[in-house]
UniProtKB/Swiss-Prot annotation:
This is T-cell acute lymphocytic leukemia protein 1. It is found in: Nucleus. Residues 204-256 form the bHLH domain. The gene is tal1. GO terms for biological process: angiogenesis; artery morphogenesis; definitive hemopoiesis; endocardium formation; erythrocyte differentiation; hemangioblast cell differentiation; hematopoietic stem cell differentiation; myeloid cell differentiation. It comes from the Eukaryota. The keyword Transmembrane helix does not apply. It comes from Takifugu rubripes (Japanese pufferfish). Coiled coil: none annotated. Transcription factor that plays a pivotal role in hemopoietic and endothelial development. Expressed in the main hemopoietic organs in adults, namely the kidney and the spleen. Also expressed in the liver, brain, gill and gonads.
Amino acid sequence: MMEKRQPELCPGSPDAESGPGKREDAAIISRQNGCKEDEESKREEGDKEGGGRFKGDEETDDVPLQNSSNGTSISIIINGVTKETASHNALDLKREVPVIELSRRDAIKAVEQRTESHLVPITELRRPPQLPLPPQQRDDARMVQLSPNAFPVPARAMLYNLAQPLAAINSLGGESEQYSMYPSNRVKRRPAPYEVELDEAKIVRRIFTNSRERWRQQNVNGAFAELRKLIPTHPPDKKLSKNEILRLAMKYISFLSNLLEDQDGGRNVSSTTDGETGLMVGAHEVGPQGGPHQDRVVGLARDDIMETMSPGSSCGSLPDGDADGSPESFMEDQDSPPAPRTLTASRGPPLHLTTRDLRRNGRPLDGSSRR
């Protein structure tokens, strides 16, 4: 017959204070932790093997022998083997276990919050958030908004007087009548400068006309350059305008024609007229002995021509009225010539001079001449 072993307890120990209530709590704890099921299974196996054991042994299997406030150690005799099981107080478990778990969770959460609070600003400083890409279907609206608005929309409408483009711009914004200044039925559509339609035939015709005019101008300039080379001037490289070139060419041609007529030397010497001075030199019928008089008259005409071709002459510098080189002024001078005066001389033929030539020359042609 097996006896239960009970250790001696000190009177001041917390185990000695435990009573029947404590034992019942320990039994409840052992059932909750699954210890009771293990003990019952082992006890049934021991009953089958031992068979002749006493009932007192079976009754004393579940009796706790030692209890404590913090934990109870239970000595159980199963098949002659003493087994000790430890169980905590139910109140202590209810108080300690949830508190420990909650404290752990709170501590973990607090640590995570601290780390997040420290990491979030650093992450924002190092890695700024990316801007979202604009949608592709609103490209037209963005282009209208990005266009520079130097004037407000009503001012631009007054400046350009474009009603349809203004309505198109307002339709994009969704407020078509906010900037409408005039009703659409009164405004007439006017083409903008960039909307001028150019026909291909017009372009080709314009190009052909420009090229033809350029070619004509080049030919005219070339002809004037060739004519300028034939006109003798005192500075050979003197620059002359087109009007001056034409006037000098006419005078030079008339001088050469008169010179050729004088060199023929007939009995009836026709009167020669200078183109510039209007000097008309007439001769009576003279024979071959009249050569000195003819040479003197030709010499005077040559001197007058050279004077007109000099830089200080009126031909080199045109009058104020003829600065533009208009042909009307030249035709007026040729159409209405002044009446010439006749100067008689005792020696030589009569001389016909105009009033303008008398004022310009201011000197007598011969010492014995009289007015």
